[in-house]
């Protein structure tokens, strides 16, 4: 039985409270809106662990704009992990294949990255495919872009698909670091078959649902 609170939340994001129709949830990295056929659950700030910290988490997360606090003790106790915002580093150590149509044609290096969490009603599966720009037959393309992660000399993160035309967090330009986004490139000669992969070429990605 679906609760009244959940029904209210579904109405708020424009979804009918129909428990017989499932869906999937994905994160659109670098954007504040979802694709035309998806519903926005929330938008926020891309966040993760400090790029030089060997501990903490290795994944990126999408923090909502308005946190809801539970029990807390202000001030750092040095007993837990810390979460930082995420900066674009394209154009520094890596190439910049991204479109700038959502940022007035300007360079977005050192700007903070937004994110959007999206719901695909009626399409219950989603997948991120690296090195593809299109989806398999029968699948819906939610967005496409380029594969990003932290740089090789930094501590490891997951690979995520950054939208091909990123946006930035307003007022978030400063070289303060935190978690970082660098473009991923194919590296031949160490188990990766080349061709068809090309040494040093930036890798695309696509997020698909069905």
Give names to the regions the model predicted.
Residues 21-198, 202-210:
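Folded, disulfide-stabilized extracellular/luminal domains of secretory-pathway proteins
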Residues 1-13:
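N-terminal, immediately post-signal peptide pro-regions of secreted/luminal proteins
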């Amino acid at each position: 039985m679906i609760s009244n609170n959940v029904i209210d939340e579904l109405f708020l994001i424009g979804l009918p409270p129909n428990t017989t129709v499932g869906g999937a949830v994905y994160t659109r990295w670098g954007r504040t809106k979802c694709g035309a056929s998806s519903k926005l659950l929330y938008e926020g700030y891309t966040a993760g662990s400090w790029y030089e910290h060997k501990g903490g988490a290795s994944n990126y997360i999408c923090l909502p704009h308005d946190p809801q606090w539970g029990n807390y003790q202000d001030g750092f106790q040095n007993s837990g992990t810390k979460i930082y915002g995420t900066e674009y580093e394209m154009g520094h150590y890596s190439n910049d294949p991204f479109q700038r149509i959502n940022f007035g044609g300007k360079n977005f290096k050192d700007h903070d990255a937004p994110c959007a969490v999206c719901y695909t009603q009626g399409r219950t599966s989603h997948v991120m495919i690296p090195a593809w720009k299109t989806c398999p037959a029968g699948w819906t393309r939610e967005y496409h872009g380029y594969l990003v992660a932290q740089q090789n000399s930094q501590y490891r993160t997951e690979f995520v698909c950054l939208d091909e035309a990123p946006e930035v967090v307003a007022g978030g330009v400063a070289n303060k670091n935190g978690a970082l986004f660098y473009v991923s490139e194919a590296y031949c000669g160490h188990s990766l078959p080349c061709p068809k992969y090309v040494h040093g070429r930036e890798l695309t990605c696509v997020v698909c649902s069905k």
